[in-house]
Amino acid sequence: MGGFFGTVSRVGCVTDLFYGTDYNSHLGTKRGGLATYSEEQGFIRSIHNLESSYFRTKFESDLDKFKGNAGIGIISDTDAQPIIINSHLGRFAIVTVAKISNIQELEEDLLNQNMHFAELSSSNTNQTELI
């Protein structure tokens, strides 16, 4: 399982993002991640392993580095997220809550079509990137 939280505001969103994502902590125990965007700094991202500690404990010391009025957070039992994508459509942060049961088959089909994957999670293709 997992859960995600996103926010866009006229003012800084870091506190809302932190508490909104923390609210989903009961939905997963492997990894947590936050990403914010500001015009001045672009994307700022942090991902932590939650297997031995709580979300709040892991991220409280990171909060000062986050800036911006748009952000997304994730609690995930599968992959390290958010991932930052740079494409012809622009740069963006993305998260998913999913379980792809045939990921190896899909990965093989896409690789045969000359696609590529950059994000790995536990030596496997990150399913968020696959989606």
Identify the role of each PLM range.
Residues 1-131:
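Conserved short alpha-helical segments that host acidic/polar catalytic motifs at enzyme active sites
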